[in-house]
């Protein structure tokens, strides 16, 4: 899943190309190797003032990654099974800006995935559950 911010892009095709471009810039995956399945729901992130236009895509084989450490802190590949397993979705009580909040996150392969990525994965998980 690439979370292309798509700033200034208006049309879905532009967002799709932006997602492929971001995937290349951040991970080194050639855009010609990415088969886009389709878009997920755009997501506005108030804290960063970005609107994210996520897409789901697939690759025919495992890519040789060239990770840009300024953009990507870690890459791991959880299985579809672990993503759809109800035990991997968790909620943490926290304080944010003086308010009690519940923060949803995934624990996948002992990696915590939260924030915008968690929200995007939640939608993807719902789609997967609808087709399995």
What positions do the PLM features span?
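Unchanged
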Residues: 9-114, 122-132
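Single conserved hydrophobic/aromatic residue that forms the stacking wall/gate
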Residues: 1-11
């Amino acid at each position: 899943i690439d979370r292309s911010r798509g700033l200034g892009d208006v049309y879905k095709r532009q967002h799709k190309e932006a997602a492929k471009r971001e995937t290349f810039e951040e991970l080194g995956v050639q855009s010609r190797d990415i088969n886009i399945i389709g878009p997920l729901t755009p997501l506005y992130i108030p804290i960063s003032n970005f609107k994210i236009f996520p897409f789901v895509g697939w690759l025919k084989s495992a890519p040789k990654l060239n990770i840009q450490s300024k953009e990507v802190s870690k890459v791991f590949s959880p299985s579809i099974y672990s993503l759809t397993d109800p035990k991997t979705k968790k909620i943490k009580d926290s304080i944010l800006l003086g308010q009690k909040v519940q923060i949803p996150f995934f624990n996948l392969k002992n990696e915590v995935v939260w924030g915008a990525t968690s929200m995007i994965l939640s939608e993807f998980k719902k789609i997967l559950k609808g087709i399995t």
